[in-house]
UniProtKB/Swiss-Prot annotation:
A Pfam family recorded for this sequence: RNA_pol_Rpb1_4
Name of encoding gene: rpoC
Oligomeric and partner information: The RNAP catalytic core consists of 2 alpha, 1 beta, 1 beta' and 1 omega subunit. When a sigma factor is associated with the core the holoenzyme is formed, which can initiate transcription.
Protein name: DNA-directed RNA polymerase subunit beta'
Residues bound to Zn(2+) 1: 71, 73, 86, 89
Disulfide bonding pattern of the chain: none
Binding site for Mg(2+): 462, 464, 466
Taxonomic classification: Bacteria, Pseudomonadati, Pseudomonadota, Alphaproteobacteria, Hyphomicrobiales
Keyword terms: DNA-directed RNA polymerase, Magnesium, Metal-binding, Nucleotidyltransferase, Transcription, Transferase, Zinc
Gene Ontology CC, one term: DNA-directed RNA polymerase complex
Annotated source species: Bartonella bacilliformis (strain ATCC 35685 / KC583 / Herrer 020/F12,63)
Entry's family note: Belongs to the RNA polymerase beta' chain family.
Single GO biological process annotation from the record: DNA-templated transcription
Enzyme Commission code(s) on record: 2.7.7.6
Amino acid sequence: MNHEVMNLFNPQALAQIFDSIRISIASPENILSWSYGEIKKPETINYRTFKPERDGLFCARIFGPIKDYECLCGKYKRMKYKGIICEKCGVEVTLSRVRRERMGHIELAAPVAHIWFLKSLPGRISTLLDLTLKDIERILYFESYIVTEPGLTSLKLHQLLSEEEYMLAIDKFGEDQFTAMIGAEAIYDLLAGMELDKIANDLHAELAETTSELKQKKLIKRLKIVENFLESGNKPEWMIMKTIPVIPPDLRPLVPLDGGRFATSDLNDLYRRVINRNNRLKRLIELRAPGIIVRNEKRMVQEAVDALFDNGRRGRVITGANKRPLKSLSDMLKGKQGRFRQNLLGKRVDYSGRSVIVTGPELKLHQCGLPKKMALELFKPFIYARLDAKGYSSTVKQAKKLVEKEHPEVWDILDEVIREHPVLLNRAPTLHRLGIQAFEPVLIEGKAIQLHPLVCTAFNADFDGDQMAVHVPLSLEAQLEARVLMMSTNNILHPANGAPIIVPSQDMVLGLYYLSIVSEKEPGEGMAFADMGELHHALENKVVTLHTKIKGRFKNIDKDGKEVAQLYDTTPGRLIIGELLPKNPNISFDIVNQEMTKKNLSKMIDQVYRHCGQKETVVFCDRIMQLGFSHACRAGISFGKDDMVIPESKSRLVAETEALVKEYEQQYDDGLITQGEKYNKVVDAWGKCTDRIADEMMKGIQAVKFDPKTGRQQRMNSIYMMSHSGARGSANQMRQLAGMRGLMAKPSGEIIETPIISNFKEGLTVNEYFNSTHGARKGLADTALKTANSGYLTRRLVDVAQDAIISAVDCGTIKGLTMQPIIDAGQIVASLGQRILGRTALLDILHPVSGEVIIEGGTMIEEADVLKIEEARIQSVQIRSALTCETRLGVCAKCYGRDLARGTPVNQGEAVGVIAAQSIGEPGTQLTMRTFHLGGTAQVVDSSYFESSYEGIVELRNRNVVRNSEGHLVVMGRNMAVLIKDENGKERAVHRISYGARLFVDDGDIIKRGQRIAEWDPYTRPILTEVDGYVGFEDMVDGLSVTETTDESTGITKRQVIDWRVNPRGADLKPAMIIHSDKQGKNIAKLHKGGEARYVMSVETILSVEPGSHVKAGDVIARLPMESAKTKDITGGLPRVAELFEARRPKDHAIIAEISGTVRFGRGYKNKRRIIIEPNDETLEPVEYLIPKGKLFHLQEGDKIEKGDYILDGNPAPHDILAIKGVEALASYLVNEIQEVYRLQGVLINDKHIEVIVRQMLQKVEITESGDSDYIPGDNVDRIELDEINDHLIAEGKKPASGTPILLGITKASLQTPSFISAASFQETTRVLTEAAVSGKIDTLQGLKENVIVGRLIPAGTGGTIAQIRRIATVRDDLIVDEQRKSSNDGISKAMLTDMTANAAAE
């Protein structure tokens, strides 16, 4: 009896413990073994009695009873008849829940093909049979016969015959001379007759012989599928079905609505169709109907089954009554609403509530205010239990009554229950892990949740009506995790960059900034104060103000913990802030003795966290917040319209610019500049004007003014205070309020030439207002798009990185990356210190002068170490990286370095992949969607010169310069670089200098900081002559290849090359400029490298010299306007990040030299140029490149070129970088390019996150030589798998396989994960599952996603530890059982047991 009672709660099978899941094709025997009976009728339920029809789709005899423990006819009711089968209605007396698990089946009268194996590319059936998909379809849908046994006739095996041909063949050869079949039976016979072993051997042999690449690919494809079938034990004929499984009825319910109608799942319709057609087919076969009718019916059955499995995959979509496509079995799995993403990865949870949030400034950081009503509902079970324990109620019913009536004792008990029971707060969208944090609830009146102001940044919450959800962790373990890991006090640092995220903002910043301002001539200036008591006394009595310059003593402690006091020049306000600082020898008063802008506050909190630990920081933050709020309130800072000061010089600046623009218009009218050049210049001029007005305005607002009556300094401008402190508003917004709005962009991204001269204080004119509506609307449209795109990017990133978990402490690798500071246009964008902080040094870092070890290899670089490195002026450091980590699964802690969210070395089990994905995805919504058009925006101007950011000695690498006729040094080389070295000969900086730039320094010059190195024209690309001589034109035919425009007022003629291929007469022209060595133009000058001085012109080039004129080497003979590169949009923002992560080839991608050598020109084609690189290394073959004519191309014959140099400019394709320069170059390219996009938006992300993602993109290797392995060259194999197999081969003394790393985009990489469950839940569900089933894949459940889907703890964090403990325990149990078996006497010695335990732990 006891067993029976226990079974009440767990009626069915026991939970199975499993380590992996295997998927394969279901055999007919399997389908029958699952089934509880055959469904013979299409009926569902009786419309009068609402009881299921017998043998129908809801039959109770097959699927189980409708009510618990009650048969259909009502003869047997209640528990006592459990397990009895009623003799009248045939229903088993059991729980109705079995209707969710019992399956049925349909016996088909004719076999049908499974559409997934037929149509899901590559079609498995067609590949196996070596027929085309079209042919297979013609056979299956009864259009053609296939010859299965030609006998002695002239027909060939597997030949297709149409109806007519078949009839003719029968007439010709007789019916029994050959066999030809049609329909799925034919395919079934063919598949069943395949001898896979023999076919595999034949294919191997054929592969060895064949040379054609296409044939190889085809053979490899077929061989793979054959081997898949052999390895998995699937039989090919199982792809053709003779029985169809029917899913349990409660998974496709039929619900009666009022009014006698029914709501039903689409599947029932689809199943009814199959049953109807199948029954009709059976009847026709029994009646011996004519072949054509039977064949038609068989085709209908095939189509019905197709629609059931995957509606719309073939033929037209089957629709229901309301013209809506029916949802087939495949649709149940696919997409956001499918089983995987809707129910397995995202579930709704009990014990949760949501409400509007309001601010709770009096809360502590670890608290949140929870409305009493909500708490009562959320904690009900706990309250019932406590009421029972205290004896207030004896039954749950009584407890329920007490709670409903809200008795006073209930509130006391609620207080007890809630004490120290954390709840989780979540704000949607949860973009990173700080979107869910734990707090201790504090009961409050009212209906809104109170949130602590400091955690708003993490949640990205504001109080304009945002809502948040509350969840209650129930189990003790969950509460523990919430408290220890998720409490808001543990999330002080941002996981993306390690900077504090609990930083005062808005009002708090304003209050603290106001406290820290210094004013001149305030009362009490120059007084000295001994302690804070005196100071407060003086402030109360208005002897001093908060901003007076005073001397004050600040007490701190030294290294030994003794109190020391020091005198500082400061203000009372700063001392008040200083009072709150924790006493610590490493934290000096200087950190407060400055204007407390948001940045400085962040630095201060960071310092406190690093030196004083978490607890002190939390207390400090709370106190700082209180102080900020109270002083913001007292200061009473607000602003009126008079605070927006318009600079007096505005009208003058605008007038100057207008004059300049007029001048450009005139130059354009005179034909001196092109339309595009004019546009660039105008846009530029207005850009500069806007900036100058903004500067003037800032100067005006910042200016310190004194009150003429009292002589005291006047209060600072409120708007300036808000903006400068970082509380609200930016310089840009101030510029629009009181400067000038400046240039606007059209929706296409181009900039409108006429700027908005007014500002908001003056008000806009109608035209200006109209112009500005463009931008505003585009902004709104962009925001909507951006959110969706950013979310999708995050989803792909999480998917690709989800199994990157810290799985080992140290992999012991000797590889790493070299880190250098990032310098852009002479400015240091990211210092070396920023980039290496919190990373592990690969080798010992030595002092460049003394040679002493600053940091040992294998240790983490901390803040103090960074200072040492920067003092030693080291320029590059080798560090370990996740990219070069050699751990088999996951990443090791040493290669990853510091856990940014905690500031300590990363723990084992940390899911660094997911953190990386969130850190990159979360700021995605802040990135722009726009593609920048090169319209000469203000950004282009800034990059027309280089200034030195260091002092040192200049060295020119690949020096190739000449002095032109004006006496300037001009760069003639393509890959010249200026190096700046310090006195010890160490490189400080490298600048690549573009062709045609003017150089201001030469080899060996001494250069000062800020000195110009070179400058160039940003709007044109020059073509320079390399020799002195006289100009001659070739193929420059007026009207065909050149147009001449003469300027009437000046008489200047401008020649521009036009597209000569448009006109058929000009098809053979090759416009070029030649330099003759003599004035008569008889001899062409020779270049130094051989070759003739002939310069081929591309379309749109403007000629700068007249024929016959004399030129010196280095002179410009033609120029190509940069806006001819206007097709080249600079993709910016989100699309650029996605493009990089997806590893797409850019549209006009750069061509990179694969070898070092000398350039030669080969025979060109009609519209392509052939370039050959003759290698320096004799053992290599020359490499050829084809380049479209008309592309700007700047190499000349005989130029030396290095491996990795660009032959054609553009964005390089990441695949090329990997193939030519290797993994490290690729990593640094991707990291820098992605960081650049984020840096533009001012978002800080640590490099290591991008490296983790790139590591996941580089998991696959393409086999180049198979050695003695089973691989075929061209296979894509997991890096880890290849290593393991090679280890085995080497151990056996065989030849290992070799391969080259390949780069996969994040979508591709996610779909190629070893886990099919994870891939199927990501995208292309049907394809992934088909592939997995054919190859009989086994999912070892190693990533996070697959474990969530099967409902287990994830193998990261605490879940990873639990799994490890369980593994050790299992090993230990096995050992004990074995030992007991061996020694039949039970007295197993204690020592032995401890021994075994130790061994198990080691394993």
